[in-house]
C-alpha cells in the first residue's frame, strides 16, 4: 500500500503505445524535479546569506552597555570590576551622538561613535571588515574618521578625503549661534554588508569626540561583550 502511488505513476510513465503521453509525462517530471532543485538551492543560499549577515552584525556590535556620563578614571575601575565576571569577554568606553556629515554640497545624517580602537577590538569585530585603511588609523593626534562603504559611495568619498561633521551642540561666534562643526580626514572604509550600518555609522576617537561635544574627560558609557549573547540579560543582572 505504501508504494501504490509510485507503482501507478511508473506504470503510466513506462506504458507503451502512448509515446507522446509518456514523453509529456517525462518532461513534466523533469520540470518539477528541476523546479524543486532550484527552490531548494535558492532557499539554502538565502538562509546562508541571512545567517552570515546576522553573524556579521551581531559580532560587530556589543551585547550590552552601561550608559551615563562616566569619567575616564571611573572607566578603569568599572572595567576591572566587570572583567571579574568570567562571562565578560571585553569592555570598551564609547561616546555616541547624531549629526550631519558634510561633503561639498552633500549632507547626510549619521550616527557618530567615539571609540578607543585599543578597547573596541574587545567588543567588536568591525576591524575585520575594512576594505581600506584600518580602525587603528583612529589612534594618534589627527582628526580622523572611518565610514561605511555605502556612505562613501553615496558621497563620492575615499581614503584621504576631508569632510565636515556638524553636531547639534552650538557654538557662539561672530555670526551668532552656530552648530558646532569640525573637519575630519577619512582614514578607513569598512563594509559589514548591513546597509543600516554601512550607510549611517561613522567612527572617531573618543578623545576627538569629547572635544567635539565638549564633555571634558568623560564618556557616555561602557559597551560590553559577553561569551553568549542570548544570556546577556542574565549576565547583566548578576553584574548589577
Model-identified regions with their sequence ranges:
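Short aromatic/hydrophobic contact patches that present stacked aromatics
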Residues: 63-65, 144, 221-223
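Short acidic/glycine-enriched loop/turn elements at secondary-structure junctions
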Residues: 89, 98-184, 211-213
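N-terminal Sec/SRP start-transfer signal
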Residues: 1-36
Amino acid at each position: 500500500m505504501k508504494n501504490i502511488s509510485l507503482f501507478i505513476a511508473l506504470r503510466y510513465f513506462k506504458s507503451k503505445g502512448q509515446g507522446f503521453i509518456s514523453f509529456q509525462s517525462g518532461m513534466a517530471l523533469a520540470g518539477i524535479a528541476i523546479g524543486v532543485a532550484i527552490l531548494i538551492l535558492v532557499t539554502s543560499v538565502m538562509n546562508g546569506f541571512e545567517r552570515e549577515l546576522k553573524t556579521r552584525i551581531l559580532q560587530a556590535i556589543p551585547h550590552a552597555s552601561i550608559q551615563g556620563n562616566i569619567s575616564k578614571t571611573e572607566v578603569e575601575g568599572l572595567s576591572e570590576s566587570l572583567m571579574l565576571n568570567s562571562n565578560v569577554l571585553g569592555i570598551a568606553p564609547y561616546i555616541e551622538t547624531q549629526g550631519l556629515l558634510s561633503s561639498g554640497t552633500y549632507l547626510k545624517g549619521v550616527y557618530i561613535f567615539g571609540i578607543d580602537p585599543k578597547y573596541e577590538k574587545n567588543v567588536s569585530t568591525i576591524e575585520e571588515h575594512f576594505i581600506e585603511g584600518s580602525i587603528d588609523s583612529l589612534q594618534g593626534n589627527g582628526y580622523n574618521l572611518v565610514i561605511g562603504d555605502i556612505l562613501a559611495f553615496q558621497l563620492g568619498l575615499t581614503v584621504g578625503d576631508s569632510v565636515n561633521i556638524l553636531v547639534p551642540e552650538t557654538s557662539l561666534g561672530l555670526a551668532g549661534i552656530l552648530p558646532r562643526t569640525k573637519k575630519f580626514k577619512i582614514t578607513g572604509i569598512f563594509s559589514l554588508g548591513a546597509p543600516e550600518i554601512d550607510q549611517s555609522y561613522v567612527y572617531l576617537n573618543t578623545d576627538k569626540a569629547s572635544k567635539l561635544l565638549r564633555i571634558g574627560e568623560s564618556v557616555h558609557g561602557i559597551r560590553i561583550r559577553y561569551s553568549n549573547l542570548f544570556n546577556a540579560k542574565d549576565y547583566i543582572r548578576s553584574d548589577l
